[in-house]
Amino acid sequence: MSHIVRFTGLLLLNAFIVRGRPVGGIQH
């Protein structure tokens, strides 16, 4: 289950970064 928690955390972090940066600007 550790990998699931890590995946969720990564997704949340990614979403937070995307929200912080201008949408449509730099997309990874």
Curated annotation (Swiss-Prot):
Q: Does the keyword Amino-acid biosynthesis apply?
A: yes
Q: Does the keyword Iron-sulfur apply?
A: no
- What keywords is this UniProt entry annotated with? Amino-acid biosynthesis, Branched-chain amino acid biosynthesis, Leader peptide, Leucine biosynthesis
Entry's InterPro entries? Leu_leader
Set out the biological process GO terms recorded for this chain's protein: L-leucine biosynthetic process
What role does this protein play? Involved in control of the biosynthesis of leucine.
Q: Provide the protein name.
A: leu operon leader peptide
